[in-house]
Amino acid sequence: VTLCFVYGLKSIWIPWLWPVFNQIFLAVYLSTWLRRSNVLTGAEWIRTRFGDDRGGRLAHIVVVAFAVIAVLGFLAYGFVGVGKFMEIFIPWEVVSPYVPFNVPVEYVPHFYGIFFTSIATFYVMLGGMLSIVWADVLQFTIMTVSAVIIAVLAMMHVSPEALQAATPEGWANPFFGWTLDLDWTGLINEVNDKVVSDGYSLFSIFFMMMLFKGILVSAAGPAPNYDMQKILATRSPREAALMSGFVSIVLMPIRYLMIAGFAVLAIVYYQELDLMTGGRIDFENILPAAMLQFAPVGILGLILAGLLAAFMSTFASTVNAAPAYLVNDIYKRYIEPDAEPRRLVRLSYLISVLVVVISTMIGLWVESINSVLQWLVSGLWGGYVVSNVLKWYWWRLNGMGYFWGMLVGIIGALLFPPLFAGVI
């Protein structure tokens, strides 16, 4: 919602950073290739590519390391996001009298993040794959109904003339020149600072790099996280391809009905929103503030339930990826091959808790949601791309080459933020 608010229709290109079109590559051939292996995890799949020699084992271990780092990054991202989101709906002034210790204003989102992450952790440990699937189905149904209602409300309360008067020239145009050319001066001056801090002013150069990087990331296949686990959990290679193909077709129209609806309502009625956090305007609070201000009674609860269900299912899928790799690919393979199932289950519980605690500690140092997202999609995935493109398409790449390529990429991703502060 924040991206649509600030960049208008040009924001449709920014998700290419992830990239959203990787589902095309998965649907056409990559999901089928992966599912035919009949393995349980992405790290285990690496051994089918490079064998069981020294290079194959090192490649296997480095994929596990990458998967765990990615899990920590995504959980820190979710921790910061859910904290800022819930701060809007549960005002600190109401909660603080019941908290037996002092929490500085700037750390209130972190307090909420810790609270809701703890609840989600118990859900992960008590639930299983079936609960995640049903939670996904339930939250999608809720969000579909909510998205249609919000889109209709936006159409009823925002006229084209009012939207045009509240936005800068070019906001409604998806196309662009060398520069972004969006000047919010005289409308909402603070948005200009947001554009500068995001670093998207030279939009053509940014777009070309984003497109090139997106094609490479898509060709590299899914990272060893819950996306790959869902592909490997499908019934057959055909269903794996169908699942990947239907994701964008089903999800995108519903998602953008709600995004665009809240964005235009927030722009036209901007003065009615409370975006202050710790004494400053935080544009990452646009979605919860717009929900609180514009969603009718009843619909607000429906949307909130759907978004929390989405957080819970995504959180559960992400957390479950860590014990899957560490228990199945490290402990069971190298430490205790004959371990009893009960012991493996208990170890999975322990690893799940440790992963959540570590990611929460990382999240305490994160200043914004966007900074974590940029590191994940630019830093960590940048280090992942080259080795994983070559593993599919260059038959001469061996396990040692893959291992060293991944290791250098991971180290570079970890060192880049502290060495080049402000770049990511």
Regions found by a protein language model. Name each.
Residues 1-424:
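Membrane-embedded helix-loop-helix hairpins and adjacent transmembrane boundary segments
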